[in-house]
């Protein structure tokens, strides 16, 4: 879609010290996309094939409904209850055969699959080896829980670091770490992967957005004024949120599936950079002063929408999914510590972070531990999705291929 920059005037009304946009002008901002319609199911190994087909029938009707409403839909997804619950009593080999079958079905029917987290209990690591083998044997998403209301899960942190190194060594160029997250406080019914999870009866769905270009267009209209930026973004995001919720509630009525809510986190995409949006606001490169303010404005706007919300409801900053963020990473404009600082006001933690292949398990434990500590301190959803590049050192360029056209590679930076 061709981008026509807004050039018209804004009429402002002053209320004391607050300047709010009273005339929203002609709306030239590009629509957010629907990144994911995610269904949550409680599967039975014996009947899962029929369960998946019934779920796909709902998802495809939902996709059609959103498209008729004017929203592009990128993916449909299915998240199961935590996989250790339905692999008890069978051998590891039998479990892997089951997951390979689920993976083959997902490819045939064109949906993304997530089998939920392991180690809900920090003392139970019995499913960790199976989790690692699921990752290297299939294209299924999964996660480990590293912090929750009961505290920081230090055993799970060690298990996550061990898993990342195993997957680095046992999958093609380590790319399967892309579909694994060490997750803290990620709430149920989150539509985004890999942290998506639920532990209930199923028969529910939620919706997640992509919106880098949408945010960039709104920030163009704000001319760098933080008050106007927040008001404009809140107003325009709320308009779309109401429209999306109306469609979702009609799907709920027609299908009998329960709608759990919208995660309006404006995820980036190959042609929809959230890094570019933030630079549009600050007038300088990502990582400079003002970046934290932009992150806070976006998060405040996302959390202000007057609809049912789920998930992170914040901001994603994945260097390996966003060309502008990738360029800044390659230039050393920001590092892991900066992303953790931004996570204090937004989310979603350390997402799609490229690391040198010689990063040690102990270094990974410390990084994941920082994410868990921050999440526990503020009781907020954060994840660590860390992707070491096998055989690559700081200063060298990655050559990842995640199977998604437009995802960038970067120059690796030394660890802090």
For each feature predicted by the language model, list its residue ranges.
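Bacterial N-terminal signal peptides
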Residues: 9-20
């Amino acid at each position: 879609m061709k981008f026509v920059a807004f050039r018209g005037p804004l009429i402002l009304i002053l209320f004391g010290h607050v300047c709010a946009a009273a005339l929203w002008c002609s709306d030239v901002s590009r629509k957010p996309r629907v990144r994911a319609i995610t269904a949550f199911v409680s599967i039975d190994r014996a009947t899962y094939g029929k369960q998946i087909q019934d779920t796909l029938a709902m998802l495809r009707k939902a996709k059609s409904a959103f498209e008729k409403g004017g929203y592009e839909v990128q993916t449909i997804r299915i998240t199961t209850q935590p996989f250790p619950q339905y692999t008890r009593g069978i051998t590891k080999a039998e479990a892997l055969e089951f997951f390979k079958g689920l993976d083959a079905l997902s490819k045939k029917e064109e949906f993304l699959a997530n089998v939920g987290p392991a180690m809900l209990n920090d003392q139970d690591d019995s499913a960790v080896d199976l989790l690692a083998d699921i990752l290297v044997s299939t294209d299924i998403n999964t996660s480990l829980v590293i912090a929750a209301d009961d505290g920081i899960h230090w055993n799970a942190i060690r298990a996550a670091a061990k898993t990342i190194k195993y997957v680095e060594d046992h999958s093609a160029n380590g790319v399967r770490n892309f579909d694994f997250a060490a997750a803290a406080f990620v709430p149920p019914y989150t539509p985004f992967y890999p942290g998506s999870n639920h532990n209930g009866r199923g028969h529910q769905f939620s919706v997640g957005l992509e919106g880098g270009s949408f945010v960039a267009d709104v920030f163009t209209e704000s001319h760098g004024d933080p008050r106007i930026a927040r008001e404009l973004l809140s107003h325009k995001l709320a308009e779309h949120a109401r429209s999306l919720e109306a469609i979702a509630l009609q799907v709920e009525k027609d299908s009998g599936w329960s709608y759990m809510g919208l995660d309006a986190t404006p995820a980036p995409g190959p042609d929809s950079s959230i890094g570019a949006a933030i630079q549009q606001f600050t007038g300088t490169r990502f990582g400079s002063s003002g970046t934290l303010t932009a992150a806070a404005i976006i998060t405040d706007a996302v959390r202000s929408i007057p609809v049912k919300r789920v998930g992170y409801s914040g901001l994603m900053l994945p260097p390996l999914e966003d060309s502008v963020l990738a360029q800044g990473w390659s230039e050393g404009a920001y590092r892991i510590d900066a992303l953790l600082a931004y996570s204090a006001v937004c989310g979603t933690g350390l997402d799609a972070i490229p690391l040198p292949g010689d990063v040690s398990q102990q270094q990974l434990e410390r990084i994941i531990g920082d994410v868990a500590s921050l999440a526990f301190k503020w009781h907020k959803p954060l994840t660590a999705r860390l992707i070491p590049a096998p055989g690559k050192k700081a200063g060298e360029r990655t050559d990842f291929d995640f199977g998604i056209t437009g995802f960038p590679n970067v120059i690796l930076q030394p660890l802090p």
